[in-house]
């Protein structure tokens, strides 16, 4: 990742470097998710993307219904580091029960929030899938479905010209 402020990286690294996340560190997952988001924003020409990249870097810092990370970091401190818009998105994302289902229901207003949640979840699932392929050589069918569905929703609801998924799927 090229555009992340060293202060943000140092802060998130200090909070997450020793926290496991599957086969690797939580920090590794957060950093690579931000990298996926950065590339996605560039590929679909989202110019004001800093808050999305920062939100991806911190996307599970408060823990989620899927990842039970807890730290003593405050919303105020995170807001100082990544800004109010990114932190508000992170806090909302972290506190959504059954997050993937709720995001896929396309029920959040304003439309910008819904789009940002789709993008954050997409970056998260793509990053985890890349790690799965690198570690095991296989893709989880549920993640394939999730990536395809979110990608389709971003194209259909927001007219975004999404890049192809970074995987080759066998045709049936």
Language-model region placement:
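Metal-dependent phosphohydrolase cores
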Residues: 1-172
């Amino acid at each position: 990742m090229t555009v992340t402020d060293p202060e943000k990286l140092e802060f998130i690294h200090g909070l997450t470097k020793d926290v496991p996340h599957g086969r690797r560190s939580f920090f590794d997952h957060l950093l690579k998710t931000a990298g996926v988001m950065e590339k996605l924003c560039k590929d679909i020409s989202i110019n004001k993307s800093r808050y999305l990249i920062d939100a991806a870097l911190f996307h599970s810092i408060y823990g989620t219904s899927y990842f039970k990370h807890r730290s003593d970091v405050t919303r105020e401190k995170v807001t100082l580091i990544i800004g109010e818009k990114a932190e508000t998105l992170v806090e909302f994302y972290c506190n959504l029960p059954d997050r993937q289902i709720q995001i896929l229901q396309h029920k959040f207003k304003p439309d910008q929030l819904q789009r940002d949640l789709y993008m954050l979840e997409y970056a998260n699932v793509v990053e985890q899938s890349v790690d799965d392929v690198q570690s095991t050589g296989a893709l989880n069918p549920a993640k394939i479905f999730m990536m395809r569905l979110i990608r389709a929703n971003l194209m259909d609801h927001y007219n975004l010209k999404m890049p192809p998924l970074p995987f080759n799927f066998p045709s049936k």
